[in-house]
C-alpha cells in the first residue's frame, strides 16, 4: 500500500489549509401527503380562497348596503377602522348573506326560516369552485351545461345549487329529509328566474337513506355534494354552538368590541335544525353510510363528494372507500382564515371509464 509522504519539518506544501465552512443544512420542502388508490396518487392540497371566488378580500359594504339597505344598521367599524358586522348576531349574518347573494349572484329573493342553518357564503362558494376544478381536470373542454349535480341536504338556504347555477350553469337536484327545508328551498327557486328550470328540490322520505329514494333508476349525475351533520346528538350540537359563541365572544372582546348575544339569541348563524346539525353516530356514521350507498350507484354517478369537518374521520373514510372498490380518491384541505375544512371526492370509475362518461354526454 502506497502511503502518501508527509512533508518534512519546515517544508512548504502546495496544499491550502481547508477553510472551516459553515455547515448549512439543506431545507427539505415538505410535500403534501399523498394517497395512492388503484395506481392513482392524489395530493391533499391546502390553500386559501379559490382564485375564482368572488369573496376574496374585504366585503364591499357600500355596495352590499346599496342592494340590501336593511344591512346598514347592522354595519359597524372594528378597531382598525374597517367596516364589519357582529357575526354572532343572527339578523346581521342573515342580511349579509342576502346582500352577497343579491350583489354577486343576481338573486332577487332569498330568505330562511328562523332557526335554520345560515352558512357563510364565501366558504360554500369555494367548495363549488373546487368541485368545478375536479371536473375540469378530468375534462378540460368541459361543457358546463352537461353537468348535473345532486346536493344531499340542500337545506332551506339552497346555497350550493344557487352558486352552481349562477357561476357555472349546472343543473341541480337538492334533497333533504326536512319538509320545511324543501318548501323554503323550492320557494327560493320559484322566486328567482335565474334558478327556475335549473334546480329541483326533492324530499327524502326515509331518513335512513341518502341516495336511495332520490336517485332514479335511469338518472345519471356528474357529481354529488354534501355538508353532513357534524354532531351525534342534540346535546352535542348545543355544546358546539355554545363553544363557537364563547370563542367568538372572547375574540371580539380582545378586539375591543361589545359582548355578543348569548346562545338563546344566536341560534341562526351557528344553529340549524336536527337534520342539519346532528344524526345518530355523528359525522363518521353519516359519511360511512354515504360511502356504502354510493357503491350502489357506482355507474350512475361520476364523482361523489362530501365535506368532512373532523380530520380524524378522513383516514377511516379512505379505508372504507378502498374496500368498497373506489378507483380514485381525492382529499383537499381548504384554509379560510383560521378555519381549516376539507372534502373528500371519490369515483368508482377509472380514468378511461371517466373519459367514456364525458363522451356519452351525461
UniProtKB/Swiss-Prot annotation:
It is an enzyme of class 2 (transferase). Transmembrane segments: none annotated. One of its GO terms (biological process) is rRNA base methylation. InterPro entries: METTL16/RlmF, rRNA_lsu_MeTfrase_F, SAM-dependent_MTases_sf. Its main location: cytoplasm. It comes from the Bacteria. SUPFAM superfamilies: S-adenosyl-L-methionine-dependent methyltransferases (SSF53335). It catalyses: adenosine(1618) in 23S rRNA + S-adenosyl-L-methionine = N(6)-methyladenosine(1618) in 23S rRNA + S-adenosyl-L-homocysteine + H(+). Keywords: Cytoplasm, Methyltransferase, rRNA processing, S-adenosyl-L-methionine, Transferase. NCBIfam families: PRK11727.1 (NF008725). This is Ribosomal RNA large subunit methyltransferase F. It comes from Vibrio cholerae serotype O1 (strain ATCC 39315 / El Tor Inaba N16961). The lineage of its organism: Bacteria, Pseudomonadati, Pseudomonadota, Gammaproteobacteria, Vibrionales.
